[in-house]
Regions:
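Conserved post-catalytic alpha-helical subdomain immediately downstream of the catalytic base
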Residues: 97-100, 125-172
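Ribokinase/PfkB-type carbohydrate-kinase core domain
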Residues: 1-120, 125, 154, 160, ...
Length: 172
């Protein structure tokens, strides 16, 4: 968890952060890497997250984290800024994400296959009022579905659906 694990967020002379060094080492041994982070309203995203993205295969963030990392406003008081989503995903790719960049929100999941340029949007499920009992762990559940799809070598579109399904299972 970037921005949460103090030791891994510390600077590293060669890699930028200790987390980036861990990810680089994993990739050196042909392991696929993924990052998660916590949402914060600070300005540590460039210093802590950017170095890690150079060694990241799969990046799955929410709209708050996506805005913090990219500097592109992905939401406002009225909701998601749809017109900025692809730009946000492209910025994650530019920062180093190698395979999939994904941004999820209550309304939609958006994904960019960084290898092919494929952009996908998958709307959230329409559920009856009161169906969702809580949102604690929602982002973690979504991420687990995405990573399962990656492990199964599914498409990025299917990965977004897997993420939504995992989220649904933990929210009731």
């Amino acid at each position: 968890y970037l921005l949460l694990l103090g030791t891994l967020d510390q600077p590293d002379e060669d890699y930028g952060t200790k987390a980036a060094k861990v990810l680089a080492t994993a990739q050196k041994y042909e392991m696929e890497t993924s990052v998660d982070m916590v949402s914060e309203e600070g300005n540590r995203y460039p210093k802590v997250v950017w170095p890690a993205l150079k060694y990241t295969d799969y990046c799955v963030v929410n709209e708050v984290e996506g805005t913090g990392v990219t500097g592109i406003q992905l939401y406002d008081k009225d909701g998601i800024k749809e017109e900025n989503m692809r730009k946000g995903l492209e910025k994650l790719k530019e920062l180093g994400v190698k395979k999939w960049a994904i941004i999820h929100s209550p309304a939609c999941g958006y994904g960019l296959n960084c290898q092919t340029g494929e952009f996908v949007k998958v709307p959230s499920f329409k559920l009856p009022k009161g169906f969702i009992k809580g949102t604690t762990g929602a982002g973690d559940a979504f991420c687990s579905g995405v990573l399962y799809a990656a492990y199964q070598r599914e498409s990025i579109e299917k990965a977004l659906y897997y993420g939504l399904q995992a989220l649904l299972e933990t929210s009731r």
